[in-house]
Structures are given as C-alpha cells and as structure tokens.
Amino acid sequence: MKFTCDTNVLVDVLRDASAEEAFSVFLSRFSHVTYLSAVVMLELRAGARTPGQARMLEQEVVQRFARANRVLTPSADAFSVAGQLLATLANREGWTADAHPSLVHDALLAASCRESGVTLITRDRDFARFKTVLRGWRFVAPWPQVSQ
C-alpha cells in the first residue's frame, strides 16, 4: 500500500508538535511507500506567507520527498478524470467549480491517487462525495494502522 497526505494533514504536522510526532511515527514505518502529491505541494507553497515559511517547507517537506523520488505528479489523464468528476458532481448537485475552487484541487488529487494506486490520508470530508463517482481509490483519516 502507498500513501500521500492531503494538505490539511501536512499543515497540522508543520504547526502542531503532537501531529508532527504522529507523522514521524507513521513515517518510521511507511516512509518507503509515502509520497508527496504535486497538488499538495502547490497548495503548501501557495500558503507559505514568509520567506522563512517557504524555506522551511522546501527543506523539510519538498526536498525530503524529491530526493527519494517520491513526488506524485498528475498525468494528463488525471486532469481529464478530475474534470469529468467535477462536471458529474456539478450536474448532480447543482453547483459550479468556480464557486468551489478548493474542490478542483481535491478532484485532481483524488484522480491522481486513483491513477497511481495511492491511498490519501486526509481529514477533509469532501472526498466522500467523490467516492460515489470516482471508483477504485481510497482515502483514510490520519493515521492508518496497517500491517507492513
């Protein structure tokens, strides 16, 4: 099983000592199968408000996964699937993507996870609505207790 963390989980890790400790314990068992999504990298970098935050993010998160060649990058197919997912949900639920911009990133993250066989670790309940349309992918709450 492979994993990637959603932005909300990594923000907690960066801000909260107990979340950082839980992440370290998780990585001690699963670092070899844990990836950083390029979608999450985008969101984290966009949220860095100071040069110090950006530097820390680059050194502590991005480079850690880049050096290990574990950055999950969505393909053109993942973008297409994400677009189809958003269109289906918009038609079913009566909303537009521009009214819910965070769902665009979430749809791309879900589609790329499915494409790569990666389980998403998240606290975001919006992913449950994707499961009704996007089959064959998994998301779990932090921190999964699975056997190696």
Regions found by a protein language model. Name each.
Residues 1-37, 46-64, 146:
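Short, well-structured N-terminal submotif of metal-dependent ribonuclease cores
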Residues 5-6, 37, 101-103, 124, ...:
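Histidine- and aromatic-rich ligand-binding microenvironments
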Residues 6-7, 44, 82, 113:
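Generic structural signal for small/hydrophobic residues in well-ordered secondary structure
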Residues 10, 41-44, 127-128:
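A generic structural signal for short hydrophobic patches within well-formed alpha-helices
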Residues 24-25, 60-80:
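Generic detector of contiguous secondary-structure segments
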Residues 51-55, 89-90, 137-141:
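Short, hinge-like loop/turn segments at secondary-structure boundaries
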Residues 70-121:
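Active-site neighborhoods of divalent-metal-dependent phosphate/nucleic-acid chemistry enzymes
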Residues 110-148:
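Acidic, PIN/NYN-like endoribonuclease modules and their adjacent C-terminal/linker elements
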